[in-house]
Structures are given as C-alpha cells and as structure tokens.
C-alpha cells in the first residue's frame, strides 16, 4: 500500500482539484493517516461533520446568527415573535488564523449534503487559493477518491 506510506498521489490530486470526494472503508483509520500525511506536508487541517451545516459558506467562514432551540412556553416581551438570535463565530475560523499555510477542511458524512451545498463547497477554494476541501461521501471496499466536481456532475 504505497499510498499509506507517502500520500503523494492524494496530495497531488488535492492540489490539482482543490475539492475531493472520498470513499473510504467503513472500519476507518484511513482518514487519520491521510490527515497526518497532509500535516507533515505543511497543511493546517480541520475535521468536522457535514451534518447540520446549512449554508456551508456562511456556516464555515462568516459570522452568522443562530436561534437557540425552543424550550416550551416563553415570554415574547423581550425577544418578539422570532426569538433571540445569537451571533456565532465561523466554525472553521481557526483555519484562517495563519495566512501562510495551506488549509485542509475535511468534512465527514458528506452524503447528507445536497447538490447545491456540494456546488457551494466547490466554489469555496476559488475565494481562498490555499483552501483545499475533502468530503467523505460514503463507504467503499477500498480507499478511493475523485474530484468533487466530477462526483456532482455524475451522481446528481
């Protein structure tokens, strides 16, 4: 398994495509090995789940508001009919603290994302040239990946 020794082909494909759809065996372990290889090559990495992202660009990169869960009967005198909106820092903000490093955003459970959300993820690296994205799209018998753009064109 030369891939697990160096990660060179994965690194080259990631640099070329900027967004990859990954299919890994369900027993796991492959993603952490590849993350370790990418860190060794100078990437700053961030791994998170794709569940509950909503608008990926806003949720990951911009300051945005959220509403806390409704906990039953509450007074509307203070907050109005819509409820209180809390400002939340971007989830992947720690990736953008250092401008000199390449950045790798790794999303688990990417199969829950819609076509439009995947298309938004494909557009993200155009704004920041050093940002690369890997989305795990499900299981496979062996570790394989392809361009996220090709995946969206062929699967939807």
Curated annotation (Swiss-Prot):
UniProtKB keywords: Membrane, NAD, NADP, Plastoquinone, Quinone, Thylakoid, Translocase, Transport
UniProt xrefs under InterPro entries: NAD(P)H-quinone_OxRdtase_su_N
Keyword Iron-sulfur among UniProt keywords: no
Function: NDH-1 shuttles electrons from an unknown electron donor, via FMN and iron-sulfur (Fe-S) centers, to quinones in the respiratory and/or the photosynthetic chain. The immediate electron acceptor for the enzyme in this species is believed to be plastoquinone. Couples the redox reaction to proton translocation, and thus conserves the redox energy in a proton gradient. Cyanobacterial NDH-1 also plays a role in inorganic carbon-concentration.
Catalytic activity: a plastoquinone + NADH + (n+1) H(+)(in) = a plastoquinol + NAD(+) + n H(+)(out); a plastoquinone + NADPH + (n+1) H(+)(in) = a plastoquinol + NADP(+) + n H(+)(out)
Protein name per its UniProtKB record: NAD(P)H-quinone oxidoreductase subunit N
One Pfam family from the record: NdhN
UniProt xrefs under HAMAP family: NDH1_NDH1N
Family: Belongs to the complex I NdhN subunit family.
EC number(s) reported in the record: 7.1.1.-
Keyword Thylakoid: yes
Subcellular location: Cellular thylakoid membrane
Membrane-topology descriptor: Peripheral membrane protein
Name of encoding gene: ndhN
A Gene Ontology cellular-component term: plasma membrane-derived thylakoid membrane
Assembly with partners or alone: NDH-1 can be composed of about 15 different subunits; different subcomplexes with different compositions have been identified which probably have different functions.
Gene Ontology MF, one: quinone binding
Enzyme class: translocase
């Amino acid at each position: 398994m030369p891939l697990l020794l160096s990660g060179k082909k994965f690194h080259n494909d990631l640099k070329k495509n900027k967004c990859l759809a990954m299919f890994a065996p369900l027993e796991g372990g492959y993603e952490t090995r590849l993350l370790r290889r990418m860190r060794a090559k100078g990437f700053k990495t961030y791994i998170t789940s794709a569940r509950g992202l909503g608008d990926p660009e806003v949720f990951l990169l911009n300051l945005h508001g959220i509403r806390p869960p409704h906990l039953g009967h509450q007074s509307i005198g203070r907050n109005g009919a819509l409820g209180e909106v809390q400002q939340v820092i971007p989830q992947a903000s720690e990736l953008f603290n250092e401008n000199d490093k390449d950045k790798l955003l790794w999303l688990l459970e990417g199969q829950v994302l819609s076509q439009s959300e995947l298309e938004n993820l494909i557009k993200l690296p155009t704004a920041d040239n050093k940002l690369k994205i890997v989305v795990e799209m499900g299981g496979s018998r062996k570790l394989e990946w392809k361009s996220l753009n090709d995946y969206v064109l062929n699967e939807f």
